[in-house]
Amino acid sequence: NEITTEDENSNKTSDESSDKSQDENNNTGDDNKNNNSLNIQDRNCRIFFFDSNALKLKYIDTTIQVEDGAIIKALTNELQNTNHNDDFLTLTKKVSIKSATIDMSTDVLEVVFSDDYTKYMTLGTATESGLLSSLICTYAYNLGVNKVSIYFGDELYTCLRGDLPEGYFNVDYSFAEEYVKEGIDKNT
């Protein structure tokens, strides 16, 4: 009843909700010395970021490279990327994904981080909540689920809520705004 989307040993199974129109990327060998065993695909996705100046959730539609079906790892790497906008709060690079699974009986995506990212970041109430929103919205949107649980090792992360009786966060990204770089008119 579970689909494993990734694990720490890099033995991943395909995610049933993955986009079937993905194109395989031609790897030239510059990216990885062991490129013969990698399956790298380009995937269109939506990344949600918290704008720490405007205190709003924004999103960017982009294409990312996914190695061996590790979509959560690839999405997390993009959430650690500061290239989009200096005002976007990005996840520290001091943590990584240990595993990610979807429980098909409950439709809950469980994401396990290597460590507590809040230990490595200076976060206030709004920014901690905003960072959590960017994580769960990015994961949920791209995997087609609406419930996400975050773990630091085997400890359930509850953010500022103190307790999560259901064991997961319900995801709502309907209030997010599309990010448009200044000087770019999307209507042309």
Predicted regions and their residues:
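Bimodal "functional hotspot" detector
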Residues: N1-T188
